Amino acid sequence: MAHNLLNDTFLRALLREPTDYTPIWLMRQAGRYLPEYNATRARAGSFLGLAKNPDYATEVTLQPLERFPLDAAILFSDILTIPDAMGLGLDFQVGEGPKFAHPVRTEADVAKLAVPDIEATLGYVTGAVREIRRALTDAQGRQRVPLIGFSGSPWTLACYMVEGGGSDDFRTVKSMAYSRPDLMHRILDVNAQAVAAYLNAQIEAGAQAVMIFDTWGGALADGAYQRFSLDYIRRVVSQLKREHDGERVPVITFTKGGGLWLEEIAATGVDAVGLDWTVNLGAARERVAGRVALQGNLDPTILFAPPAAVREQARAVLDSYGNHPGHVFNLGHGISQFTSPDHVAELVDEVHTHSRAIRSGAAG
């Protein structure tokens, strides 16, 4: 067991070691589906007021752990902290999502981009990591569950930086990629350096695993995905600290819509690959043949179904993977703000119960 961790099931699963049951955590597990999160956000005044205050970030990171016996905590933050630190002027408008005051569109904009000083500009994130680690640890120095740090991928960050916010079709960033690949690669190079430095700073502050969210990699065509996303994920992974404080630090990457490229993603040097719900988990396990762990991959909208259906679909995911090491249960994307916390409780219980039955051979 990782030293002083009361529950290291998540870390052992990422390293493909045997576990008594399948660990579970959920993307966006600290979020708007929880009434207590909304209460804390109201006190903070805004999303950025929440994310940039280590006390609030710690409070909301721990909220889902108070409700559910989840096997990992994930830092409460946002993937757009890096471009914000680059001076692009991040703001969240109610009902509109993130917007940048200074999108990166011209040659001059690209020339101005630089890797931010992580401690000077993103010290609130590393401060939150340290504070969360303390909050997860009891008076005897025993930590409840591991803490995950994260970043957006170079390509996904570039999507927001060039578009100036979210997009239905990403035509501005894709147009740049195809018409001025030199500018696109310059942005991606700066982003890759920044992401690696940012994740390493989180690891040094106490993150025990890190995840790269490539939310928009699946928007790219085959070939373009390799050039503009995967190549830069590989660069990031090659620069990461894989051990800290005497313990291995596993790396997860998740490309939404990336099931086509599973084998290539698995070859980037990561320890685990996250999958969305379009991928057959059992077939994916055979495709990677034990080279990496897999994370996923329940369709998050299943949580709107009645509890019996939630449990049935959770069992289907677990049965698909089978009695093999190297599976972390998660959703195929972030949990919806409209999800009932009671249904999440049903899911967590079923994952733990049924995976124990699979291990013991009692699952029918």
Swiss-Prot record:
Substrate binds at residues 28-32, 78, 160, 215, 333. The record marks 78 as: Transition state stabilizer. Gene3D superfamilies: 3.20.20.210. The keyword Lyase applies. It comes from the Bacteria. Keywords: Cytoplasm, Decarboxylase, Lyase, Porphyrin biosynthesis. This is Uroporphyrinogen decarboxylase. PROSITE patterns: UROD_1 (PS00906), UROD_2 (PS00907). It catalyses: uroporphyrinogen III + 4 H(+) = coproporphyrinogen III + 4 CO2. Its EC number is 4.1.1.37. Catalyzes the decarboxylation of four acetate groups of uroporphyrinogen-III to yield coproporphyrinogen-III. Pathway: Porphyrin-containing compound metabolism; protoporphyrin-IX biosynthesis; coproporphyrinogen-III from 5-aminolevulinate: step 4/4. Homodimer. GO terms for biological process: protoporphyrinogen IX biosynthetic process from glutamate. InterPro entries: UROD/MetE-like_sf, Uroporphyrinogen_deCO2ase_HemE, Uroporphyrinogen_deCOase. CDD domains: URO-D. One of its GO terms (molecular function) is uroporphyrinogen decarboxylase activity. One of its GO terms (cellular component) is cytosol. Belongs to the uroporphyrinogen decarboxylase family. It is found in: Cytoplasm. It comes from Burkholderia cenocepacia (strain ATCC BAA-245 / DSM 16553 / LMG 16656 / NCTC 13227 / J2315 / CF5610) (Burkholderia cepacia (strain J2315)). NCBIfam families: hemE.
